[in-house]
């Protein structure tokens, strides 16, 4: 048996010597000779794969253990390369102490140093030494820290340069400079080092003080950290990979932004200069007015910005005494405008990244008009959502590809390891057969490969054995580490693996939840060492382990660490396989491969086997040791002092405590205490009474004492040695210690910092809350996987912060105290010092870059700021943050959120709750029976209540007993027939010997842990069964009846009634879905009871019976008729028969489609009527009265509809439908408000509130519109997981909120001066605190106010955090926090500067992680639902799916007749021109030129420029018109058969009309709005869209968008509905709010239109803080509660509670749900589109095939001659092309020929497709599929039966040639014989006339010329002599044709291309 990894032992490592080099040279020479010897055959694909380097022997990887132990003397020495790939390369390897591989070139370095030179060897040794890289890394880090300081001496710089130079020299000496592979400059990372050093010397030589640009290059040194740390290189690789992939998206983004920017330029140029100017201002002066000259310009109240306005009817208007005029500058320092293409592009980029876009939106709408909202809707939905998410999709895909590669690498390693294990296993068996004790391997220290600490290990093993603990938790199966190890070794593991814990997931396998501490002490287990070893070696999974030892408590007095916490209560944790062999019996495979004992008779082999086993043992131990955290000496010390075994009484005391702390009720109590403690902490607020404060303090002390006691008890019960091996316990211990510290410290000072630690206790809930646990794990895993990425992000932030500081710090006017003052104003965001620079960069990463950039551009040069900010934005925000999201999404997997982790642990909390419930039910039963026996009441029997099943008709949904442990326990108490004795039932949860049974579907049973039932208590598993035919259906129904026969009298239909109707066609009908859950006698998990289809459903599917069944159901549910027999009526007798007829009539009315349409129409009308009830309704009495009447009419109609449905459907059916309930509630609201109005109670507050609920009316449309209903159903499916994540987010945020309350409660108040606009904060030198503010208030203008959004209590804290997480309004909160001093003190500028960090940490963990978890959850959930639907899209209706599939297939293709060339010679000439490719290219170039000329346009351009541009435009219109006319002239009626031509035609018509209109309108400018002119000019932009035709990558992305459209339309519809309802609510609640912040005369809730404007803006969560701000006003100085309003109400204050609820719910619904659904759809369709585009053959390739075909087959006969095939194959492009010479490839394709040597189109396409895709099963299905499609769309192919094939013809050809040659040779021999004078001819015998020619002539004829036509089968067709060929083409002789084909191909190549088709 050969060991798979080469020879074993130190022979693997051979020094690199001159002999080794000579051997390599020999190999290289041999390789070259071999290469020359075999010239590559032309026309043949080189199938042989090139050899590749081994993955695990790559440079920078660690050498795997199985290459043996590296002797110390070979560390750092040149060794021969182990990778066979490099046997022909001049290389050698060097290994350092940690076995890391470094590969070097064996050529001379710098032409001076050979590989054996002493200097070079020393350099090599130094360069691979670990201390060298540590020294360099430390130097780089110190250098980075120094760079953040400005006051350090220049000499320090030189020191660093010297170190870097030394490093470079060492590397160059060791590797060589650049010529050969593995030299210094061949590694791109070294380019970075080299450039840094070069620049340092350039800087030293020239004085660089003036050139700050070059100085900033020093910053790149931070990147050197990447090159030093190997893990980072991989991530950078992924980043670069994703940037490459972004090329197409970047092009598409730039293209779309350019188009939108051009539209913006045409529509809005110059508009943002419109401002309100005082009446009477001189017009010439107005033109030069800028915002600085504030005297004449109206300033918007509450801001410092001028009020913009427009002259359109729906634009913003000026106040009285002001008029709207165009001035000289734009808003925001003149940077926000559409005046030129560049500024418009910047504005559009800002819109795409959604930074402060609401400001641009409001400015533009105010200046241009509300109708332009359409432009913003398009840009936000197409530009922002679509493009940004495409970037996410691309990055995600790039990351996944990288991950797949990594996985493949791991799998390759795993495979090798398995092979090694098999070898080891066999050798082990042989050793055992020879009687060698395998445990003696541990003492096999003579071998150089012996495990390092085998002798240390032995005593530990013995000491453990002597402990004699038989704790079942130590068994191999239950230890998570071992499971992981076994799975790594490829063995089966005990517990079923949850689907997401795959070994090869995208992250390192995380530790098992149930055992967070990984392994017990050092990974070697109690019990028999040898059996454990053998079980690993024999590959026997834990499932075969046989029964495990059980004991209620360990025999040893030490209770062990896990006993009682996870594995207690005697529940089996291993999955016990039936019939598993007990003991170390060999499996069959093992016996089969058993090696003979003779094999090891020779001493050498025995020795070798020992050595192999020893190596493999060391590999296994290496795995174990990787888990060893402590050195062995410390472990023995810990075992001695930290396991407390004293006198028996102490042990007894320990036992008692042990029982106490492991009881489920103890766990429940602790959990309750954590919850109550959290509530206590959350109750802190400001202002707080002393008594309340004292109560909280007392509570804190009580809880601290309680948790301290818990910790003490656990330490005593478990012993410290075991207690501290659980991570949760360590966590507990830290928190308790900190709490005690906090109690001991004084009340003031660092109190709040310590307090925050107490909050972490909330995380203990994760032990009993699976979702929280899972999300913490996801964040943990992501942070783990993201460790490197986070580091890269940190480096990026660091570098950009430093660059910013170096380049810009001087421009910000920095003072000594670090405050930046510019134009007399203090700046918060500047780059004066590193901390502020870091904050600016961090803010850009949060997506807020534009405002910082404006300030930067004001203080510095524009280009530096633009470059810096946009680079950070694109690199940091778009790429790195998206990579983060990609990793987060990958951390999710299938059933993470739906099912809690299957970790085999009985959840103590659930056990405790189950016990309580069981006890409660027992108590209630006892009380019931007591009352019954005493009062002698005849109550219905409990048995019937609990056990009775409804009759068969409703069997569909109710025939299952829930898995829920408690329900099962309780529900079965009253069913003695189902289980054992009654008294045992309550205990079945905790007692494995008690089972409860339920009928189980045949063939379904599984053996699983009982824990899963309790674990999945609240889960439901859905199971579908599809009966395979009539028999099964009947059987199922029969079973359903039997199932209930014992319990209920049969009613409804039975299977006998069904039998006659179930014909053949119902055989494959699927039964409806049934929630299948149950507990049975063989399974305590997921057993499914019998699935019963509803017979009525089956019958409804039979058309003949559908009519009869079309009757109303019973009116009342079963329960009513059972309790009140009067409800049960006989419909065949007189009074009820009439009623029955009425019901049937109502039923037919309600079911009629016209009725439904009428109701939908009414719903739409009534919803529309609500939109008119706005703030100005009182001013329109006529409209008001109409609305009142219509409201009554609608209410009556809806009430009538409801009554009709009650009569038709009956109460049971009506009230069991969720949509009907919705209708019922909404109708009741309308009815109540109507009655209140009639009774004149409509002014009562509660009735007013109820009236606002009429806004819910549109919700009724949901159930009627299929598109929306589909989306809502998908959403409802996702609600459980969304709520789960929402809850977990709230817990996360609770911690930050309580922390915020501790840090900032009461500190946000300030003294403001109300005279300024906006209110200014009074200087803290003038007013220091609250009392000062009141004392100084002589003028009455000073107010002591609080910031509206603050941290005074936890609820407000949540609101503040929501604003921070959505980055809206967060600046004000941060400024207040940073300026805060103390409670009731006046804030001071940046007093607590480092409070910024609180927000930074929250944004990373609270904002970034939790909000992206939503994306993850939603996408994940929709994928789940998709799987359930069998991969169909869940957001589309059936109709839309048809569109989607049509888009995907793009119709079945067929050869089209090409447009015939016109006969007229002039037309023919033009036809030749327009069908040339060059013509298309020229037109494309002109379109690009046109685009460029449109970009040149600006606002305020000179008259001359306008004229020139006008002429150029006219020229382009003429050109495109000319093109259009030419094409129409040449192509005639065929012009309009092409969609693009139609598009061109429309664009040309629009362009001409826009020219005419602009001429007309310019003369009538006073009558028309110039806006109309602008819209018409947009037609020109349509021309640009023609460019899309040319770009394939962009087409794919747009194709993805087209495929997304139906689903996006549905989601958009739902979003519109939500906006509609909220805008009605907004009008009812906030119409009278004061104009302030985001609310003004245009953006408000006064009318429906304005409300929609506001709601569209906050759909992306933009500016919601501004809309909320005025609603939070409750009184002076902000608003006046007594001010009368126009609609009769009083006050302009808001209602904070309603406002907060309104905005937070809207943001959660729209932003988190709807927008994320949008993302989910785009990601999905992008994947589909790219899959289709990355397939080897796409639709485009087939199109191209047909286009080429048209040229060769102008008559569309579908056949071409075989002679033309070679040219056809060469003319094709893309993957289908077969370049010349291609004859033999085509012949080998074996194409069928029809008479006339013709080949059919489809046969060629199949053959070429096969040539690209290779042989595969899918090809056959594709072939039949294509054939069917083709037959459907084309004339029948059957008329042409093939008579031969190309291969057959070639074989016949060659056969003929061979026969001819043989005959000639024969004749030649004859002639030679005859010319021989000695030969006597015997002509009469031969009977053949002899040739007269001589020998030479004959030879010339045979070899020189080739007269025989059959030998040149290149361009001419075969001779038409095939009629004689029979059709049996199967008997093809395999004549070797390759040589003749090769000759022929060479001939063909020489002859050149043969002519194509005529």
Swiss-Prot record:
Intramembrane segment ranges: 341-365, 834-854, 1355-1376, 1648-1670
A GO biological process held by the record: establishment of localization in cell
Transmembrane segments: 126-149, 155-174, 188-206, 213-232, 249-272, 373-398, 659-683, 695-718, 727-746, 753-772, 789-809, 864-889, 1149-1172, 1186-1211, 1218-1239, 1244-1265, 1285-1312, 1393-1419, 1473-1496, 1508-1531, 1538-1561, 1574-1595, 1611-1633, 1699-1723
Listed GO MF terms: voltage-gated sodium channel activity
Intrachain disulfide bonds: 276-318, 856-865
Tissue distribution of the protein: Expressed in dorsal root ganglion and trigeminal ganglion.
Membrane topology qualifier: Multi-pass membrane protein
Compartment annotation: Cell membrane
PTM remark: Ubiquitinated by NEDD4L; which promotes its endocytosis.
Family, similarity comment: Belongs to the sodium channel (TC 1.A.1.10) family. Nav1.8/SCN10A subfamily.
UniProt comment concerning the protein's domains: The sequence contains 4 internal repeats, each with 5 hydrophobic segments (S1, S2, S3, S5, S6) and one positively charged segment (S4). Segments S4 are probably the voltage-sensors and are characterized by a series of positively charged amino acids at every third position.
Remarks, miscellaneous: Mus musculus is sensitive to the pain-inducing components of the bark scorpion (Centruroides sculpturatus) venom while Onychomys torridus is not. Gln-861 may account for the difference between both rodents and its replacement by a glutamate, the corresponding amino acid found in the Onychomys torridus ortholog, allows inhibition of Snc10a by the venom, which in turn, inhibits sodium currents, blocks action potential propagation and may induce analgesia.
Protein name, UniProt field: Sodium channel protein type 10 subunit alpha
Naturally occurring in which organism (per UniProt): Mus musculus (Mouse)
Lineage of the organism: Eukaryota, Metazoa, Chordata, Craniata, Vertebrata
Gene coding for it: Scn10a
């Amino acid at each position: 048996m050969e060991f798979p990894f080469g020879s074993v032992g130190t022979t693997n490592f051979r020094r690199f010597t001159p002999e080794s080099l000579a051997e390599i040279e020999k190999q290289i020479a041999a390789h070259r000779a071999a290469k020359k010897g075999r010239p590559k055959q032309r026309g043949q694909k080189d199938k042989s794969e090139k050899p590749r380097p081994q993955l695990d022997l790559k440079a920078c990887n660690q050498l795997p253990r199985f290459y043996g132990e590296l002797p110390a003397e070979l560390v750092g020495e040149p060794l021969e390369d182990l990778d066979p790939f490099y046997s022909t390369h001049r290389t050698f390897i060097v290994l350092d102490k940690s076995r890391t591989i470094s590969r070097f070139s064996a050529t001379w370095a710098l032409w001076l140093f050979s590989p054996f030179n002493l200097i070079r060897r020393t350099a090599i040794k130094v360069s691979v030494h670990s201390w060298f890289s540590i020294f360099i890394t430390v130097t780089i880090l110190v250098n980075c820290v120094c760079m953040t300081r400005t006051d350090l001496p220049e000499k320090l710089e030189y020191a660093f340069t010297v170190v870097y130079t030394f490093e470079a020299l060492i590397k160059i000496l060791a590797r060589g400079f650049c010529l050969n592979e593995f030299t210094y400059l061949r590694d791109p990372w070294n380019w970075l080092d080299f450039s840094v050093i070069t620049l340092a010397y350039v800087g030293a030589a020239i004085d660089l003080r003036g050139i700050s640009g070059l100085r900033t290059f020093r910053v790149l040194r931070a990147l050197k950290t990447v090159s030093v740390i190997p893990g980072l290189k991989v991530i950078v690789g992924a980043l670069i990979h994703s940037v490459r992939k972004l090329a197409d998206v970047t092009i598409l983004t730039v293209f779309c932004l350019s188009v939108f920017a051009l539209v913006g330029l045409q529509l809005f140029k110059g508009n943002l200069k419109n401002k309100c100017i005082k009446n009477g201002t001189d017009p010439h002066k107005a033109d030069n007015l800028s915002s600085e000259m504030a005297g004449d310009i109206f300033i918007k109240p509450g801001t410092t910005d001028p009020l913009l306005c427009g002259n359109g009817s729906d634009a913003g208007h000026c106040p009285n005494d002001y008029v709207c005029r165009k001035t000289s500058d734009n808003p925001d320092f003149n940077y926000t405008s559409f005046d030129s293409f560049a500024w418009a592009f910047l504005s559009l980029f800002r819109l795409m990244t959604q930074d402060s876009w609401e400001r641009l939106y409001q400015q533009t709408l105010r200046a241009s008009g509300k109708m332009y909202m359409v432009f913003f809707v398009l840009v936000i939905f197409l530009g922002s959502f679509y493009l940004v998410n495409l970037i996410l999709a691309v990055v995600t895909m790039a990351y996944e590809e990288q991950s797949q590669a990594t996985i493949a690498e791991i799998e390759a390693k795993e495979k090798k390891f398995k092979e090694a294990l098999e070898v080891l296993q066999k050798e082990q068996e042989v050793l055992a057969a020879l009687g060698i004790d395998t445990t003696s391997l541990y003492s096999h220290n003579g071998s150089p490969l012996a495990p390092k600490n085998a002798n240390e290990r032995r005593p530990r093993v013995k000491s453990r054995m002597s402990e004699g603990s038989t704790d079942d938790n130590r068994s191999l199966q239950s230890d998570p580490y071992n499971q992981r190890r076994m799975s790594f070794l490829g063995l089966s593991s005990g517990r079923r693996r949850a689907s997401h814990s795959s070994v090869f997931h995208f992250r390192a396998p995380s530790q098992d939840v149930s055992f967070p501490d990984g392994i017990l002490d050092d990974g070697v287990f109690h019990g028999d060492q040898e059996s454990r070893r053998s079980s690993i070696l024999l590959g026997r999974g834990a499932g075969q382990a046989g029964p495990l030892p059980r004991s209620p408590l360990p025999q040893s007095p030490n209770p062990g660490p896990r006993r009682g916490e996870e594995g207690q209560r005697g529940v089996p944790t291993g999955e016990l396989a039936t019939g598993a062999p007990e003991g170390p019996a060999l499996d069959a495979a093992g016996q089969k491969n058993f090696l003979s004992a003779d094999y090891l008779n020779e001493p050498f082999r025995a020795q070798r086997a020992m050595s192999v086993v020893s190596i493999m043992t060391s590999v296994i131990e290496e795995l174990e040791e990787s888990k060893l955290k402590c050195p062995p000496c410390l472990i023995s010390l810990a075992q001695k002092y930290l396991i407390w075994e004293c006198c028996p009484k102490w042990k007894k005391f320990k036992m008692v405590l042990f029982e106490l702390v492991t009881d489920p009720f103890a766990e429940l109590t602790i959990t309750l205490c954590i919850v109550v403690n959290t509530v206590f902490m959350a109750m802190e607020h400001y202002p707080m009474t002393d008594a309340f404060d004292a109560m909280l303090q007392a509570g804190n002390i009580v809880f601290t004492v309680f948790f301290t006691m818990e910790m003490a008890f656990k330490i005593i019960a478990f012993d410290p040695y075991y207690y501290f091996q659980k991570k949760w316990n360590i966590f507990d211990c830290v928190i308790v210690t900190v709490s005690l510290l906090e109690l001991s410290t004084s009340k003031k000072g660092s109190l709040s910092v310590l307090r925050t630690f107490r909050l972490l206790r909330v995380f203990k809930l994760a032990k009993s809350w699976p979702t929280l646990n899972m999300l913490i794990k996801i964040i943990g895993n992501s942070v783990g996987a993201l460790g490197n990425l986070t580091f890269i992000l940190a480096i990026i932030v660091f570098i950009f912060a430093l660059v910013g500081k170096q380049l810009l710090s001087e421009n910000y006017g920095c003072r000594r105290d670090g405050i930046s003052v510019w134009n007399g104003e203090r700046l918060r965001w500047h780059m004066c010092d590193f901390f502020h620079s870091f904050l600016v960069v961090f803010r850009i990463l949060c997506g807020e870059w534009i405002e910082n950039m404006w300030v930067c551009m004001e203080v510095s040069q524009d280009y530096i700021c633009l470059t810096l900010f946009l680079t950070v934005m694109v690199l940091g925000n778009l790429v790195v943050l998206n990579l983060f999201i990609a990793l987060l999404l990958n951390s999710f997997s299938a059933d993470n959120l739906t099912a809690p982790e299957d970790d085999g642990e009985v959840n103590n909390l659930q056990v405790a709750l189950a016990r309580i419930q069981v006890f409660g039910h027992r108590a209630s039963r006892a009380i019931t029976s007591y009352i019954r026996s005493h009062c002698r009441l005849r109550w219905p029997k409990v048995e019937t209540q609990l056990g009775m099943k409804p009759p068969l008709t409703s069997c569909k949904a109710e025939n299952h007993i829930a898995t829920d442990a408690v329900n099962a326990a309780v529900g079965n108490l009253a069913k003695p027939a189902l289980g054992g004795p009654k008294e045992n039932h309550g205990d079945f949860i905790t007692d494995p010997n008690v089972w409860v049974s339920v009928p189980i579907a045949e063939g379904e049973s599984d053996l699983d842990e009982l824990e899963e039932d309790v674990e999945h208590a609240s889960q439901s598993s859905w199971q579908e069964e599809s009966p395979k035919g009539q028999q099964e259906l009947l059987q199922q129904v029969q079973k359903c009846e039997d199932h209930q026969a014992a319990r209920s009298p049969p009613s409804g239909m039975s299977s006998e009634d069904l039998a006659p109707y179930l014909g053949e066609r119902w055989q494959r009908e699927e039964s409806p879905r049934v929630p299948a859950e149950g507990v049975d006698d063989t399974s305590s998990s997921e057993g499914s009871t019998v699935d019963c289809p509803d017979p009525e459903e089956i019958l409804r599917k039979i058309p003949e019976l559908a009519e009869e069944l079309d009757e109303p159901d019973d009116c009342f549910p079963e329960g009513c008729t059972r309790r009140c027999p009067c409800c049960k009526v006989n419909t065949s007798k007189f009074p009820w028969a009439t009623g029955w007829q009425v019901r049937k009539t109502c039923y037919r009315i309600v079911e009629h489609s016209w009725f439904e349409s009428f109701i939908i129409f009414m719903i739409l009308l009534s919803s529309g009527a609500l939109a008119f009830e706005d703030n100005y309704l009182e001013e329109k009495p006529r409209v008001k009265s109409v609305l009142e009447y219509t409201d009554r009419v609608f209410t009556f109609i809806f009430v009538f509809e409801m009554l009709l449905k009650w009569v038709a459907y009956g109460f049971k059916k009506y009230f069991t439908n969720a949509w009907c309930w919705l209708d019922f509630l909404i109708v009741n609201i309308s009815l109540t408000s109507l009655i209140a109005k009639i009774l004149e109670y409509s002014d009562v507050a509660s009735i007013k509130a109820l009236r606002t609920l009429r806004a819910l009316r549109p919700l009724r449309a949901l159930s009627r519109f299929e598109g929306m209903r589909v989306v809502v159903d998908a959403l409802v499916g996702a609600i459980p997981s969304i709520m789960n994540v929402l809850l977990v987010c709230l817990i996360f945020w609770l911690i930050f909120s309580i922390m915020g309350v501790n840090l900032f409660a009461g500190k946000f108040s300030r003294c403001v001066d109300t005279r300024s606009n906006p209110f200014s904060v009074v200087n803290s030198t003038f007013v220091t605190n609250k009392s000062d503010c009141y004392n100084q208030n002589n003028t009455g203008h000073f107010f002591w106010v609080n910031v509206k959004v603050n941290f005074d209590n936890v609820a407000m804290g949540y609101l503040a955090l929501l604003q921070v997480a959505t980055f809206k309004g967060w600046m004000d909160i941060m400024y207040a926090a940073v300026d805060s001093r103390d409670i009731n003190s006046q804030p001071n500028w940046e007093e607590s500067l480092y409070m910024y960090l609180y927000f930074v940490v929250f944004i990373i963990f609270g904002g970034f992680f939790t909000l992206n978890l939503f994306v993850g959850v939603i996408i994940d959930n929709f994928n789940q639902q998709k799987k359930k639907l069998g991969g169909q899209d869940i957001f589309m209706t059936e109709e839309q799916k048809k569109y989607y599939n049509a888009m995907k297939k793009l119709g079945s293709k067929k050869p089209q007749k090409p447009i015939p060339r016109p006969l007229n010679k002039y037309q023919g000439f033009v036809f030749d021109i327009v069908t040339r490719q060059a013509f298309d290219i020229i037109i494309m170039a002109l379109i690009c030129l046109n685009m460029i000329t449109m970009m040149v346009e600006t606002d305020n351009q000179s008259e001359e420029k306008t004229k020139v541009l006008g002429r150029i435009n006219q020229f382009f219109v003429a050109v495109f018109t000319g093109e259009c006319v030419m094409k129409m002239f040449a192509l005639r009626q065929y012009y309009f058969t092409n969609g693009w031509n139609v598009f061109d035609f429309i664009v040309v018509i629009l362009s001409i009309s826009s020219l005419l209109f602009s001429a007309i309108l310019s003369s009538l400018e006073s009558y028309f709005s110039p806006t109309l002119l602008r819209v018409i000019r947009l037609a020109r932009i349509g021309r640009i869209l023609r460019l899309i035709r040319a770009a394939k990558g962009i087409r794919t992305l747009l194709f993805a968008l087209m495929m997304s459209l139906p689903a996006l339309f549905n989601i958009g519809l739902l979003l519109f509905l939500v906006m509609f309802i909220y805008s009605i609510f907004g009008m009812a609640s906030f119409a009278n709010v004061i104009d302030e912040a985001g609310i003004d005369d245009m953006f408000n809730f006064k009318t429906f239109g304005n409300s929609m404007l506001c709601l569209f803006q906050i759909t992306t969560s933009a500016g919601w803080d501004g809309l909320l701000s005025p609603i939070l006003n409750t009184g002076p100085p902000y608003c006046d509660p007594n001010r009368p309003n126009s609609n009769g109400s009083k006050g302009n204050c808001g209602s904070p509670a309603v406002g907060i609820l309104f905005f937070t719910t809207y943001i959660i619904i729209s932003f988190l749900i709807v927008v994320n659904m949008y993302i989910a759809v785009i990601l999905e369709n992008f994947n589909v589109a790219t899959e289709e585009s990355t397939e080897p053959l796409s639709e485009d390739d087939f199109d191209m095939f047909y286009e080429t075909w048209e040229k060769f087959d102008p008559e569309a006969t579908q056949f071409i001659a075989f002679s033309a095939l070679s040219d056809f194959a060469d003319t094709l492009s893309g993957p289908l092309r077969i370049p010349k010479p291609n004859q033999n490839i085509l012949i080998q394709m074996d194409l069928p020929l029809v008479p006339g040597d013709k080949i059919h189109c489809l046969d060629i396409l199949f053959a070429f497709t096969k040539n690209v895709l290779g042989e595969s099963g899918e090809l056959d299905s594709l072939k039949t599929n294509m054939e069917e499609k083709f037959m459907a769309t084309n004339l029948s192919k059957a008329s042409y039966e093939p008579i031969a094939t190309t291969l057959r013809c070639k074989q016949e050809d060659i056969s003929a040639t061979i026969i001819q040659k043989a005959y000639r040779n024969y004749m030649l021999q004859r002639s030679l014989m005859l010319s021989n004078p000695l030969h006597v001819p015997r002509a009469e015998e031969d009977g053949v006339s002899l040739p007269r020619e001589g020998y030479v002539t004959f030879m010339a004829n045979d070899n020189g010329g080739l007269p025989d036509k059959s030998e040149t089968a290149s361009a001419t067709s075969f001779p038409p002599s095939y009629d004689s060929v029979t059709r049996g083409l199967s008997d093809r002789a395999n004549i070797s044709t390759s040589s003749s084909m090769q000759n022929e191909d060479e001939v063909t190549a020489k002859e050149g291309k043969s002519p194509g088709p005529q």
